[in-house]
Amino acid sequence: MSEEEWDAVIAVHLKGHFTVYRHAMAIMRKQESGGSILGITSGAFTASTAQPNYSAAKGGIVSLTRSAAMTAASISLRGGPAINANCLAPTARTRMSDNVPFAFETGDPEDIAPMAIYLLSDQGRDVNAQIYSVVGRRISVWNQPREIRTMYSPDEAWTPEEIASMLPNTIKQEPNPFIDDLERRMKEMEAGDKSGD
């Protein structure tokens, strides 16, 4: 991937969301009536081996939305208008993805509209800093990032050797379902290649 390809995708997706968020937040504060900001971030959690620029941009939109939600909350807590910021992470078949094999469930683009309308309506006004997936008839909420396990250095500062000794038996690693699925599919392809010989 060239630097130009990287920059183009980041500019369209991440900078595009930033530009909308910045102007929308300023208008909502000025008119004192509040409102809702909605980011679209399909691909943020299903990292792509072929398009790291797209995955990075979409992951950046998640962080940008969380930052906008925190800013909106601080405005509201200081007596300003109620503004919220959320993301939709849809998985739907489009013309761009029709020929791409999906390992996961997919829906249709029109399945996403009711959730978007809800989040942008007065009924969704109390929903803030959330990431929702919409796939067909299923709607899911993603967890908020937080520390889940901690370890402490027995001395003043960590050494690489202490980390190597302690990490596997204390905080360990979190399983990654997408890498697990990739490994499974690669084994299936390899088995299929061998059976075809």
Model-inferred region functions:
Residues A73, N84, V127-A129:
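Short, small/polar-rich loop/turn modules that mediate ligand/substrate recognition or access, typified
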